[in-house]
Amino acid sequence: MTIIRKKHPLIKIINHSFIDLPTPSNISSWWNFGSLLGLCLIIQILTGLFLAMHYTSDTSTAFSSVTHICRDVNYGWLIRYMHANGASMFFICLFLHVGRGMYYGSYNMIETWNMGIVLLFAVMATAFMGYVLPWGQMSFWGATVITNLLSAIPYIGTTLVEWIWGGFSVDKATLTRFFAFHFILPFIITALVFVHLLFLHETGSNNPTGLNSDADKIPFHPYYTIKDFLGVLILLMGLMILVLFFPDVLGDPDNYTPANPLNTPAHIKPEWYFLFAYAILRSIPNKLGGVLALILSILILALLPLLHTSKQRGLTFRPITQTMYWILVADLLILTWIGGQPVEYPFIIIGQMASIAYFAIIVILMPMAGMIENNILNLD
């Protein structure tokens, strides 16, 4: 068996990636989220495949086809809610994975980090298009509002929006193409995941100390396969509690009303995992400025390697930057809350303050804290 594992052209790739992979001996549970994201992707592809067997991407039948899945298909309700809540679990794992990378300085592995940012954009695009497919009120108006943002692009904006819509409004053509893209993107994401892993295995994993761990490596299997399996059990338990007891807690009641272009919902808002970016978008009165801020809210992650000023890699031994980091986390929670609130006083000003704080902490305060800590270390 050992000979096959190490010699077979196909199996040896798996062997070098998941079995004999030299791994730092001290990586904590924060390193579990990579494998959990892989699990989420598999769950989403499988449940999505079975949903696609019964779904029809036509404006006249899309809403009723989802109802049909829930009522008439064997365990259709389970597949549908696993897919919807699986997306939420996916984003929880994504945010924790990115947060771990920021805390421990994993962004210094630049190729892996940039590939991760591309993956984040791809997953966000997929989730957005998936939200349009049930063709409820929030699906329709969410699609209208978000695609309309592209009209802020000078000169070509309006033409671009109509090209994406396939007409003069969000309609049948839009729904059909969104379904096509929503189906293909997870497979593109899977390919990108392998590239992400390829870059990661070039450098090896980071660890909580931020130090070189070449002198202290252990094989991935059985140590981290067992550890990852525990994470898998916890994730699946959390997902099934959500699906079986609170399936609609993260959804919007408006999406149980069929799409109606003549009736605008009181508060148009995306799923909870986009609310922080939506709050940043809304906090700028200018349309183009809002769109740029929205894109920058994610793209700013690519600047982290350039903004790293500390002599140490992670935040483990850096209390000042640690404080800034946790203020940033609190700020993101505030933005998420604001994104779900109506556009009125005092939410507008809170959103604007939180948006300024978000960019200021990342671009100014954290690099400054790193330099202050360097100076403290130099004091005799």
Curated annotation (Swiss-Prot):
Changing I348T: In strain: Isolate LHS 541. Coiled coil: none annotated. GO terms for cellular component: mitochondrial inner membrane; respiratory chain complex III. It is a multi-pass membrane protein. It comes from the Eukaryota. A ubiquinone binds at H201. SUPFAM superfamilies: a domain/subunit of cytochrome bc1 complex (Ubiquinol-cytochrome c reductase), Transmembrane di-heme cytochromes. GO terms for biological process: mitochondrial electron transport, ubiquinol to cytochrome c. GO terms for molecular function: metal ion binding; ubiquinol-cytochrome-c reductase activity. Changing V232A: In strain: Isolate LHS 541. Heme b b562 binds at H83, H182. InterPro entries: Cyt_b/b6_C, Cyt_b/b6_C_sf, Cyt_b/b6_N, Cytb/b6-like_sf, Cytochrome_b, Cytochrome_b_C_euk/bac, Cytochrome_b_N_euk/bac, Di-haem_cyt_TM. It is found in: Mitochondrion inner membrane. The keyword Transferase does not apply. The keyword Signal does not apply. Disulfide bonds: none annotated. The cytochrome bc1 complex contains 11 subunits: 3 respiratory subunits (MT-CYB, CYC1 and UQCRFS1), 2 core proteins (UQCRC1 and UQCRC2) and 6 low-molecular weight proteins (UQCRH/QCR6, UQCRB/QCR7, UQCRQ/QCR8, UQCR10/QCR9, UQCR11/QCR10 and a cleavage product of UQCRFS1). This cytochrome bc1 complex then forms a dimer. Component of the ubiquinol-cytochrome c reductase complex (complex III or cytochrome b-c1 complex) that is part of the mitochondrial respiratory chain. The b-c1 complex mediates electron transfer from ubiquinol to cytochrome c. Contributes to the generation of a proton gradient across the mitochondrial membrane that is then used for ATP synthesis. Heme 1 (or BL or b562) is low-potential and absorbs at about 562 nm, and heme 2 (or BH or b566) is high-potential and absorbs at about 566 nm. This is Cytochrome b. The gene is MT-CYB.
